[in-house]
Amino acid sequence: MGAEFLVGRSGSGKTKLIINSIQDELRRAPFGKPIIFLVPDQMTFLMEYELAKTPDMGGMIRAQVFSFSRLAWRVLQHTGGMSRPFLTSTGVQMLLRKLIEEHKQEFKVYQKASDKSGFTAQVERMLTEFKRYCLEPEDIRRMAESGTASEYRGERVLSEKLHDLSILYQQMEKSLADQYLHSEDYLTLLAEHIPLAEDIKGAHIYVDGFYQFTPQEFRVLEQLMVHAEHITFSLTADKPSYEREPHELELFRMTGKTYYRLHQKAKELNLDITYKELSGTERHTKTPELAHLEAQYEARPAIPYAEKQEALTVMQAANRRAELEGIAREIHALVREKGYRYKDVAILARQPEDYKDMVKEVFADYEIPYFIDGKASMLNHPLIEFIRSSLDVLKGNWRYEAVFRCVKTELLFPLNEPKAKVREQVDQLENYCIAYGIKGDRWTKGDRFQYRRFVSLDDDFAQTDQEIEMENMLNDTRDWIVPPLFQLQKRMKKAKTVQEKAEALYRYLEETDVPLKLDQERQRAEDDGRIIEAQQHQQAWDAVIQLLEEFVEMMGDDEISLDLFQQMIEAGAESLTFSLIPPALDQVFVGNMDLSRMYGTSCTFVLGANDGVLPARPDENGVLSDDDREWLKTIGVELSSGGRERLLDEHFLIYMAFSSPSDRLYVSYPIADAEGKTLLPSMIVKRLEELFPHHKERLLTNEPEQVSDEEQLMYVVNKSVAQSFTASQLRLWTREYDISDVWWSTYNVLMSEQDRLQSKKLFSSLFFRNEVKQLERSVSRQLYGERIQGSVSRMETFNACPFSHFASHGLHLKERQFFKLEAPDIGQLFHSSLKLISDRLREQKLDWRDLTKEQCELFSYDAVERLAPKLQKEILLSSNRHYYVKEKLQKIVTRVSGILSEHAKASGFVPIGLELGFGGKGPLPPLTFQLKNGCTMELVGRIDRVDKAESSKGLLLRIVDYKSSDKGLDLAEVYYGLALQMLTYLDLSITHSADWLGMRATPAGVLYFHIHDPMIQSNLPLGLDEIEQEIFKKFKMKGLLLGDQEVVRLMDTTLQEGRSNIINAGLKKDGSLRSDSAAVGEKEFDLLTKHVRRTFQEAGEQITDGRVSIEPYKMKNKTPCTYCAFKSVCQFDESLEENEYRPLKAEKDKTILEWIKKEADGNEHS
């Protein structure tokens, strides 16, 4: 029995020596005793490939490459150690989730933390660490109870942590005893079964690529030393460490410590020990500067490198994106100009998660094949999401979010249906469910989904053919979504045990054809060359089956709730990872500086060399803190390295990365993150400057104009990248900056290609201005027709912003509807409630002034009850919260009807029209305009309320409009066409009064009635009558009145002098109007109505002529963009030269009337 220790610095040729030795052995005796090459998991593929490509051998039987886990499987298969099933990390996490729920009341520290996401995984990692370091549950319990830990900082926190962990550890071992094996037990079993393994006896074993070993692994190595014929240990170190452990500040502390322990064990076993120390740097024979870096990295003081050097490049970038794109360009240059293959290039990062997603995006753009080393989570795979969301549907009472998470995995889609069509149907159904608030038994009960595009609270319309077609499609889509999930729900309710629930879930997957659908996706991915994706589909299905099998194996007969079942499935799913091998040989390797292993790398890029990243700051996200670990170490408990030791080992990891390439090393760092926050360079960059004082940093930039013309050529990598950078350079040229001739040449090449449509579209965007051209008359006619029928509010929308009108009425764009009660819905309810009360009064031959308080309450209650089922898809009946809202609305309607009754008692005006229609089937004709361009425009709508009164002037009419917001009539808004409704309604009523009422009427005014439930604030105590009086004042109507005292007295018969409590007017002692009254003369009313008509005429002509410009107004701080639904469509941006608000000047009513009079005079003379 013998042991050889092979020692040398990085690049000295240790691995190559081992491979040569194995190859020589294979040539000498192809069928001799076994040769075992033991390496880390990440290195097995590389070493197998290196041995397999030996030119003069057609294959190998004698030599095999193993990791510890693969060696364990091999030995245990041959020696009978596989009698009990192994539980993977996934199975252990599911078991732990169950144990946590069962024992959380016994915890001292982790009662609350145990419910948090990720806790199960942290505990599993901790218990795995205990196993790796050969600590039994009893050891942990003893430490918790001994009081030793409690001395730590005078607190019992560590003791209580160990108490909680010992409970879970003990219960886990109890659950596994004699039935299953923890995934970490394989090494313990391996050590026990090596004496029985014939393959080990007489074997030659080579151990390479490791920096350190766990106690479990040391036990295995001890048995290998005892039973193998010869074992060779290869370790990266500057000298043998057989007399003492190295000092903790030495660069090779980690490997030196490992060397010492292995050497001591070999001595204990009386092995024949030989030593081989490799000096020199075989890897860097052609690159003396890299040899200098390897030799001097840890030297203090450093010896500067005086010669010319090209093998090292330090690069600074503005951000990570610029850094990665610069590296992609450099890789292209290495492959294109220097003759390298992609497989010769490696990219290493200390925090690869900062770059992972960006690597995929950038390398796809630059057409660089790559392989990202490491295991990716399966959580985002459609199958895992399908299972999780399906269980969420059952647990969450069929919330639409969970249902559509499930459906959008596309694993529920009908087999062999066109996916594009099904996706469209699913989107339509999702919009419907969001708008109608579909959840719970509304999915599963037999009632069909009812679809109505337009719903009125006042009228019932028959369904249109389009609505019927949509309704049928929605129900057909629902009919293939619900049955499988509903069947799963029924089976889960019936299932009691874990096995029954697992069977229900598996049957659900089978019945929805998930295996077949995944196989189709796998085949599609293979056909398209997406090899990794194809592997992932197969691995995901295998992982789910294994998860369910382990679940049933562990606790198949246990009765658990659906909630706990889901938690355990979630815990298991969170631990599932893809394990992939490189799908091709010629790829750039992207790895982790800590875990990845490389061999034969020519060029290495080290990314993200920033302060706090390289060397990395240790994190303390584990169950035990660094202080906990340090304390346990002082009492002889060995665990994995704490933060302090990990920080000491960082320089070794950096050294290994820097010495990994044979030809070129690139070190880069960004100076800002994605949010623009400053990032500082690492101390390593400073160290490189000391070692190479003549070296100049390069700048990696995505702005070619910052580098020379020759360097700008590097940006022309391929067509898509060239298009992007050419566009950015031409954009500078449009701003009158000089650009290199490189880009004009590139532009000419791109535009001369046969396939130049994409380039043409891209470059045309350089001259884009966020403007909309006026529609051609023919297009306008196709959109609107020769005869426009619209509403007053539509004209107001046009005057506010022509593009908003075009989006809503030309393109018919609509916002997604949500199942929630909004202000327009409440306003609609108030209007319709007051109409119903008015209709009931008319039926009972009552007047508003006759209403009692009890009648107000009864009528209001009945009105809201009748309307609630029609309002916003029955939202007021959908929940207890909305029932409460309904009661509040009933109280408001009661309050309002009481105020209207009081107003009626104090008024000479009486209602003669409620919800009075004009146009269509209404009693009044539409407001019609013959436009100059030959089109006709009709305005139709409804007037909330028209009141009449008899006076010495004859018949008076006024308009009352119900508003759920406090509003008055702003004549500036009237002038600019933003508030046209009230004067239009008055105009129509007056114009057609002779035909409608039998006599010509005079305008009395327009008033807004604010529907609300006011709160009264007072510094003094008030009696009930005083409170009612204050509330009454809050309902004062605002608007514009005819400036006549008789009219004012008719509107408020209680008014003698002073301000009215009913209208915004008042009388002086002599009976004349107060100056603060909102009143004008009859002539001014005539001017205003004529101005409104002119405004309609102009708007109609502009609409039909095709005006669609992006021109929102701005008056004071008010702009229609604030609540516009189409901001994302027009993309109005005030910072753009062509986008400016249309300024409207706010003036007093007197000034506005003067403007209108001047315009009217001008029109008369023209």
Swiss-Prot record:
GO terms for biological process: DNA recombination; double-strand break repair via homologous recombination. Changing F68A: Reduced recognition of the Chi sequence, reduced generation of the Chi fragment. At low magnesium concentrations there is no nuclease activity, but helicase activity is unaffected. Binds 1 [4Fe-4S] cluster. Changing D41A: No longer recognizes the Chi sequence nor generates the Chi fragment. Residues 1-278 form the UvrD-like helicase ATP-binding domain. Changing C801A: Loss of iron-sulfur group binding, loss of DNA-binding. Changing F210A: No longer recognizes the Chi sequence nor generates the Chi fragment. Keywords: 4Fe-4S, ATP-binding, DNA damage, DNA repair, DNA-binding, Exonuclease, Helicase, Hydrolase, Iron, Iron-sulfur, Metal-binding, Nuclease, Nucleotide-binding. Changing F213A: Wild-type Chi fragment generation. The keyword ATP-binding applies. Its cofactor is Mg(2+); [4Fe-4S] cluster. ATP binds at S10, G11, K14, T15, K16, T236, R283. [4Fe-4S] cluster binds at C801, C1121, C1124, C1130. Changing R70A: No longer recognizes the Chi sequence nor generates the Chi fragment. InterPro entries: ADDB_N, DNA_helicase_suAddB, DNA_helicase_UvrD-like_C, P-loop_NTPase, PDDEXK-like_dom_sf, PDDEXK_AddAB-type. Its EC number is 3.1.-.-. The heterodimer acts both as a highly processive, ATP-dependent DNA helicase and as an ATP-dependent single-stranded exonuclease, acting in both directions. Recognizes the B.subtilis Chi site (5'-AGCGG-3') which transforms the enzyme from a helicase which degrades both DNA strands to one with only 5' to 3' exonuclease activity. This generates a double-stranded DNA with a protruding 3'-terminated single-stranded tail suitable for the initiation of homologous recombination (Chi fragment). HAMAP family: AddB_type1 (MF_01452). Belongs to the helicase family. AddB/RexB type 1 subfamily. This enzyme is a functional homolog of the RecBCD enzyme; unlike the RecBCD enzyme it degrades both duplex strands symmetrically. Despite having conserved helicase domains, this subunit does not have helicase activity. The conserved residues of the helicase ATP-binding domain line a 3'-DNA channel in the enzyme and are responsible for Chi site recognition. This is ATP-dependent helicase/deoxyribonuclease subunit B. It comes from Bacillus subtilis (strain 168).
